[in-house]
Swiss-Prot record:
Plays a central role in chromosome condensation, segregation and cell cycle progression. Functions as a homodimer, which is essential for chromosome partition. Involved in negative DNA supercoiling in vivo, and by this means organize and compact chromosomes. May achieve or facilitate chromosome segregation by condensation DNA from both sides of a centrally located replisome during cell division. GO terms for cellular component: cytoplasm; nucleoid. The gene is mukB. Gene3D superfamilies: 1.20.58.850, 3.40.1140.10, Immunoglobulin FC, subunit C (1.20.5.420), MukB, hinge domain (3.30.70.3500). It is found in: Cytoplasm, Nucleoid. Keywords: ATP-binding, Cell cycle, Cell division, Chromosome partition, Coiled coil, Cytoplasm, DNA condensation, DNA-binding, Nucleotide-binding. One of its GO terms (molecular function) is ATP binding. Pfam families: MukB (PF04310), MukB_hinge (PF16330), SbcC_Walker_B (PF13558). This is Chromosome partition protein MukB. It comes from Pectobacterium carotovorum subsp. carotovorum (strain PC1). It comes from the Bacteria. Residues 337-418, 511-603, 780-810, 847-1116, 1206-1265 form a coiled coil.
Length: 1479
């Protein structure tokens, strides 16, 4: 036996007067007694707040405010709390013996609005030993405690093992948990449910008959039949949808051609533009790629031209530099030629001057000889004149001396004097101061020897002098010759120089003889050197052109390679034309083939599109025509099989629908005739009585009653007996059972229950064994379960039927499509894919184009290589003969060596040429140079010195001899000279003096003559010398000029210079022609580059424009593709056959479709606007949006419950298949769904009867309730008269109003409302719509009127009104009604709650003192019988012997207010238990 949950205690923490107080609640009645303001209402308010923590509902007022709509500002809660955290908790033990602490944390909110903050929470699993106050407070001293905050409470609870704390943010969650745990009687899902519960508690608290309860007693007592309402709503929705679908089908049938036209024209309009844009995009892409290729090729060509221009500019610079060098060389060569010519002229002048000089030299030599001879004669004359002069002087001196010695004495005296003079003179001359007459002999010998030596020297010098005098002229001539040859030479070195010159003259003459051979050799070598330089220049040019350095030794092998390469390139160039022609022919063939395939491709694509559709529709793949024809035969067989299966499903479906219709009868009557019989007999169907039987009990009762489960229960069988005789329309077996339908039980049969079966003793000798049915149908729950399974099965069969019907239609359509396909496309569909072949051929064409372009490039490159190779070969042919020159590394050295030798030989030649004759003249005179002409003078001086020395020696010897001779004279000191002895000598001397003077005069005359002649000769010599010197100077100048010219003026020099000049002129002309050619080529190249740059700029501009168009088109195209793919219309729009049409054709196609579309969408504003927007050619995505809008429009028009596809095109294709089938099926479905008005009336009546029976059962519990004069209380339930009329018309006169119920424009609810208005025209419906009124009429509660009646005194049964009853009677009557409501709620929520949970029952009653003792006892009895807890408040203990009583006294102590509580347990049945506690 499941026990009912109970409230164990109520705990208040920090309430006004209650710091921490727990009230243990009695299992029946808990009484709160005390005076006014003791805290009774506060305690109940705390209980109600913990039970319903909704500030929008809580309003605690006094009983004096019972009728008021508003109370105090704080609604009675704020003033009951103290500052800080407050708690109100309920300790509950439910049917599962689970202890649950539910409560709220309250806290005053500061402010003038006096608000209160409430937080609900629960604590589960709290041990029994722990009291709520222990968990909510914390002891801080011996007599002090602190209230915990909610967070601290949560932390403390979480520390306990097995205890759960849960805080709630919504009251719904809080009440949901309380319902699941059995704390509240019903699930409070919404604020309306909470309001009803609060109104119930409030009515109980303040007592009396609550008008809020009685006015809406139906809402409190009668459960909402949501299942019936939902069934009606679902039925109406299904009917509405069915009718809308049928209407949509009819509209679709009427609009089918419009749909086809719209989708066809929209597809043509958009697909043509889509494919045109696709084609243009491809064309633009190809154009952009072509422009990019042209751009790249032009850039490459420009780069090549720029490289060529750079190379030519470099070559031009080189040529210009070379031209400058050549011009310089040419100018130098011209200048050299001029110099050579000048030198030749100079050489001629030099030769003339040389000839003149030779002649002058010869004349000058002759004149020199004449002058020399004249000078010698002059010298002789001078010597003779001097001798004559000397002789005159000596004679004069001698004459004078001899005159003085005329006297002997005088002579002796003179001799002595002379001896003395001689001695002094000897001493002076000999520088002998010691000389005396005595030692004079000794000194005389030595001085005589000196005199002898001096004489010998003088003789030798005289000899030399005579010889020198003889060779003096030749020496001067030879010295002049040496000076002429060697320049200024020391006279002492003249002989050595002359010897060297004569010795070198032979080699000089040999070298001079080698000049011409060396010149020829040098000319030859210089020619070879120039050729070598030209060859090196050619080799450098060749290497530069070929980009590689070559050695001369490699040229022969390179020539062989070049020859082989030229031969190869020549063959390649020769083959290039044939190869290119072959490629061109293949390209033309491919283009012709592509044209043919392009013509055939649309036909093949259309066939493939049809084949793809057929493959998608059939799910098969077809490889050849045989498979297509075989599949057509299979389609015929499949159609026959599917038709048979569909008919079988239809039969099964009809059977199930019959079962559903039979089980759907009201009251569980499978035969509608039984309802009529039950009404006729005034009975009730047994199935109706057991209509509320649970699903678990249904098999038992079904087996218990067996075939009689469809019996009619009547109150008296005898009254029915007479009516049985005339029965015609009734089942074959009709069971009648006597019993009270209001209190029927199953005691009719003696029954024994077995395992899944029962044995029923029908009579003494008749038993019936019935097994529990596998699918019970007894009771509403069993029938609903069976109906649900049957409906599911029916839905499955309906779906199968629809699928099979669709398959049949689809197969038929598919067969027709195959027939059309065979007749139209079978001939071409299995051909090879022309597009694949086109792609292959296009790829091959691209390869051929690239091959031809590459081939042309390679051919051009080969031609260039061929030309380069030929040019290189030509250069090599020039170089090959010069390899030996290139390899001759010593040529330059030899040229320099020969040039040095030639310089030497030319120098020698010039020397011989200049001095050859002089050397010839010098050769016989060289010996005379041994004596220097200046040495002749020296010799003369030496001779004069020797003569002086000899004279001095002679004088010294003479002086000594005179001293020696006059040694005797020293004795003549006293002698006188003898003058007479020398008289004859004087005469001789005079005579000789005369002769000498005459000779002297003659010599002087001759000297003057010779002097004049010498002067003449000297003048001639000077003239010749001057002329010779002038010509010599001129020759030197000419020679210097020739040397300054620096060229050799030989016979071949001019020819070589002219040849060199001509060669340089030719090279310069060639260079200039090459430069002019390069300039022309550079000009052409620059023009080509300018053209290419202009072309490049144009290409770049066109490419960027094209690329911008492509990018812009790509952005638009991406938007288009995104729209297309996101909406799945690519397959419809990407019609490949349109890709082969021209843009103008596609534009024309789109324009034609546009015109048709304008007419087609003229009545549709949305499509018309979208179509107008789509006409913008710059926004192609808008056409797609229009197509999508058309699709969406068609999707909306073709609903998914009609056509099973999202594609309107496929929907249109399926439409003809589906429309007829759906029309037929939906018509049948409407007939099936449309419930009859009689059925509706029966359902409402049976529901009313069921609820009336339930109210009667509730009334049985109120029969023993008595309060004061009230002996009994009951609920009276009556059907309203207007609604009874409506039910009668629905069940019996529905044919009269079929215009309402058969109208497709009205739902059943609207038709019901219209019928109600038709039956009750006097009733004002206000602003409510027929649908709202109809929905109200489908709710059975609106058919009933409920009122509370009391049996009071002599008045009998009266309507319970507060005015007709005393306060106690009203309180008791109201409490009875509330108990009935709570009990009704529990039964109503039984299915929602766990089977092992029976909820707590608790009500309140304030001011219970108004009840008398009998009423109190009745109330206590009611609580005991209904297992209900009651909390009452009274000024005094009204029933101390029962329940638990708390005496509350409010006291004030030291400005602190608290309530003193004394508890007393009832002593009527057990010993009293008194407890006292103060808080």
């Amino acid at each position: 036996m499941i026990e009912r949950g109970k409230f164990r205690s109520l705990t208040l923490v920090n309430w006004n007067g209650f710091f921490a107080r727990t009230f243990d609640l009695d299992e029946l009645v808990t009484t709160l007694s005390g005076g006014n303001g003791a805290g009774k209402s506060t305690t109940m308010a705390a209980f109600i707040t913990a039970l319903i923590p909704d500030l929008t509902l809580l309003h605690f007022r006094n009983t004096t405010e019972a009728g008021a709509t508003s109370g105090s500002r704080d609604k009675g809660l704020h003033g009951k709390l103290r500052a800080g955290v407050c708690y109100s908790t309920l300790d509950v033990v439910n049917s599962r013996h689970q202890r649950v602490l539910v409560g709220v944390r309250l806290q005053q909110v500061a402010g003038r609005d006096r608000k209160v903050d409430i937080k609900p929470f629960t604590i589960q699993g709290l041990p029994t030993a722990i009291q709520p106050t222990q968990i909510l407070t914390q002891v801080v001293g011996d007599r002090q405690a602190r209230v915990l905050s909610l967070q601290e409470l949560k932390d403390r609870v979480e520390e306990m093992e097995g205890v759960q704390f849960k805080q709630f943010n919504s009251i719904t969650d809080y009440h949901s948990l309380m319902f699941d745990l059995g704390v509240v009687p019903r699930r409070l899902r919404s604020a309306s449910d909470r309001s009803k519960f609060y109104r119930l508690i409030e009515a109980s608290l303040y007592g009396g008959i609550s008008s809020a309860i009685t006015r809406s007693l139906r809402d409190y007592l009668l459960p909402e039949n949501s299942g019936v309402r939902k069934a009606f709503q679902d039925m109406e929705a299904a009917l509405r949808e069915n009718r809308m679908t049928l209407e949509a089908i009819r509209v679709t049938q009427s609009d089918r051609d419009l749909f086809k036209h719209l989708i066809s024209e929209a597809t043509s309009y958009v697909a043509a533009d889509y494919m045109r844009h696709a084609n243009e995009r491809r064309i633009h892409l190809d154009g952009a790629l072509e422009l990019r290729r042209d751009l790249f090729s032009s850039r490459k060509q420009l780069s090549s031209e720029q490289y060529r221009h750079v190379e030519m500019a470099r070559e031009l610079a080189e040529q210009s530099g070379a031209e400058g060098d050549l011009e310089t060389d040419y100018q130098a060569a011209s200048d050299h030629l001029n110099l050579v010519q000048t030198a030749m002229r100079q050489q001629e002048k030099i030769e003339r001057y040389n000839a003149d000089l030779e002649e002058l030299s010869y004349r000058l030599e002759e004149q020199n000889e004449v002058v020399e001879e004249a000078r010698e004669q002059q010298a002789e004359n001078e010597e003779r004149a001097d001798a004559a002069e000397l002789e005159v002087d000596e004679l004069k001196s001698q004459l004078a001396d001899y005159q003085q010695a005329l006297d002997v004495q005088q002579t002796r005296a003179i001799q002595y004097q002379q001896a003395q003079q001689a001695l002094e003179r000897a001493r002076t001359l000999c520088q002998l101061p010691d000389l005396t007459a005595d030692n004079a002999d000794e000194w005389l010998d030595s001085y005589q020897a000196k005199e002898q030596e001096a004489t010998e020297i003088l003789l030798m010098l005289e000899q030399k002098l005579s010889v020198a005098d003889a060779a003096h002229g030749q020496f001067e001539q030879a010295y002049q010759l040496v000076s002429k040859i060697a320049g200024a030479v020391n006279r002492n070195e003249a002989w050595q120089v002359a010897r060297d010159l004569l010795r070198d003259s032979s080699s000089q003459r040999y070298q001079a003889e080698r000049v011409q051979p060396l010149r020829m050799r040098l000319s030859e070598l210089e020619q070879r050197l120039r050729e070598q330089q030209d060859a090196e220049r050619l080799l450098q040019d060749f290497s530069k052109r070929n980009g590689q350095d070559y050695q001369p030794e490699e040229l022969e092998s390179l020539q062989q390679e070049l020859d082989a390469r030229i031969e190869t390139l020549s063959s390649l160039v020769a083959e290039a034309g044939e190869r290119r022609m072959a490629l061109r022919q293949e390209l033309e063939q491919i283009q012709l083939r592509i044209q043919k395939l392009t013509t055939r491709a649309p036909v093949w694509l259309a066939a493939q599109e049809m084949l793809t559709q057929l493959s998608e529709q059939s799910g098969e793949t077809f490889e050849d025509s045989r498979q297509v024809t075989e599949f057509m035969q299979q389609l015929l067989e499949r159609e026959r099989e599917t038709t048979v299966e569909r008919d079988d499903i239809a039969s099964r479906k009809r059977q199930i629908e019959a079962q559903i219709e039979r089980l759907s009868q009201p009251g569980g009557s499978e035969d509608p005739r039984l309802n009529a019989l039950a009404e006729r007999f005034g009975g009730v169907l047994l199935s109706e009585i057991y209509d509320d039987v649970t699903l678990d009990d249904a098999p038992y009762f079904s087996a218990l009653y067996g075939p009689s489960r469809h019996a009619i229960v009547v109150a008296d069988l005898s009254l029915v007996r007479e009516q049985l005789a005339g029965l015609e329309d009734c089942p074959e077996d009709l069971y009648l059972i006597e019993g009270d339908p209001q209190s029927f039980d199953d005691s009719v049969f003696a029954v024994e229950e077995l395992e899944r079966a029962v044995v029923v003793k029908v009579a003494e000798r008749q038993w019936r064994y019935s097994r529990f049915p596998e699918v019970p149908l007894f009771g509403r729950a069993a029938r609903e379960m069976r109906l649900e399974s049957l409906r599911d099965e029916r839905e499955a069969l309906a779906e199968q039927y629809a699928t099979l019907s669709f398959d049949v239609q689809k197969t038929q359509r598919l067969h027709q499509s195959f027939s059309r396909f065979i007749g139209t496309h079978l001939a071409v569909v299995f051909d090879e894919d022309p597009e694949a072949e086109i792609r292959t051929l296009s790829s091959r064409r691209g390869e051929l184009d690239r091959a031809i372009a590459s081939f042309d490039g390679e051919n051009q490159q080969q031609r260039q290589q061929y030309e380069q190779a030929k040019e290189a070969s030509v250069q090599l042919n020039k170089l090959i003969p010069r390899i030996s020159l290139l390899c001759d590394e010593t040529l330059q050295d030899r040229v320099e060596e020969i040039r040095a030798e030639l310089d030497e030989t030319e120098e020698s030649a010039r020397f011989i040429q200049q001095h050859g004759a002089t050397l010839v003249k010098l050769e016989p005179l060289v010996s005379v140079l041994q004596s220097d002409p200046q040495q002749h003078e020296q010799l003369q001086e030496d001779y004069a010195q020797a003569q002086n020395a000899q004279r001095q020696a002679k004088q010294q010897a003479f002086a000594l001899t005179e001293v020696v001779q006059r040694r005797a004279h020293f004795s003549y000191a006293d002698s006188a000279g003898m003058l007479g002895e020398n008289a004859g000598l004087n005469d001789k001397l005079r005579h000789r003096l005369e002769l000498a003077e005459a000779e002297r005069t003659k010599a002087r005359e001759q000297l003057r003559q010779h002097q004049a002649q010498l002067t003449q000769y000297s003048q001639v010599q000077a003239s010749l010398k001057s002329s010779y010197d002038a010509k010599q100077d001129m020759l030197k100048e000419l020679t210097q000029e020739l040397q300054d010219i620096g060229v050799r003026a030989d016979a071949d020099a001019e020819e070589r210079a002219r040849q060199r000049r001509d060669e340089l002129h030719a090279a310069l002309s060639t260079n200039r022609s090459r430069r002019n050619q390069l300039e022309k080529q550079i000009t052409f190249c620059e023009a080509e580059m300018d053209s290419l740059q202009k072309k490049l700029r144009k290409l770049e501009r066109d490419y960027h424009q094209m690329r911008e168009q492509v990018v812009t088109a790509k952005a638009g195209w991406c938007a288009v593709m995104r729209l297309v793919k996101d909406n799945g219309v690519e397959r419809r729009l990407h019609r490949r056959e349109l890709a082969y049409m021209e843009g103008d054709e596609l534009r024309s196609m789109s324009d034609k479709a546009l015109g048709a579309l304008r007419l087609a969408v003229a009545d549709n504003e949305h499509l018309r606007d979208v179509l107008r927007l789509s006409e913008d050619p710059k926004r192609p995505e808008r056409k797609i949006q229009f197509y999508i809008a058309v699709y969406q429009h068609l999707r909306e028009r073709i609903r998914q419950d009609i056509i099973r596809t999202d594609d309107p095109v496929e929907a249109i294709e399926q439409m003809e298949i589906e429309l007829n089938r759906l029309t037929e099926e939906l018509t049948a479905r409407e007939q099936m769904l449309a419930i009859s008005s009689r059925s509706v009336a029966n359902i409402i009546r049976k529901t009313i009867q069921r609820e009336q029976n339930r109210i009667r059962m509730l009334n049985q519990g109120l029969q023993a309730v008595a309060f004061g004069q009230v002996k009994s209380v009951r609920l009276n339930v009556n059907v309203r008269e207007t609604h009874t009329t409506l039910l009668n018309v629905l069940s019996e006169q529905q044919e009269m109003h079929q215009d309402l119920f058969n109208s497709n424009r009205l739902t059943f609810s609207e038709a019901l409302a219209k019928l109600y208005q038709r039956l009750n025209p006097e009733i004002d419906m206000g602003q409510r719509t027929p649908q709202t009124i109809g929905e109200e009429l489908l709710d059975y509660r609106n058919y009933l009127e409920m009122e509370v009646e009391v049996n009071r005194g002599a008045d009998g049964w009266l309507r319970a009104e507060s005015g007709a009853l005393s306060t106690g009677e009203a309180i008791g009557t109201g409490m009875s009604i509330l108990v009935m409501v709570v009990q009704s709620w529990e039964e109503e929520s039984k299915r929602l709650r766990g089977k092992d949970i029976i909820p707590c029952r608790l009500l309140f009653l304030d001011e219970a003192a108004r009840l008398d003792a009998k009423s109190i006892a009745t109330l206590f009895e009611l609580c005991d019988r209904l297992e209900m807890q009651l909390v009452i408040a009274a000024p005094e203990n009204i029933s101390p012997e029962k329940g638990t009583t708390y005496k509350l006294v409010r006291k004030v102590y030291q400005n602190n207010e608290h309530v003193h509580v004394v508890g007393l347990r009832g002593f009527g049945a057990e010993a009293p238990d008194t407890q006292e506690q103060a808080s």
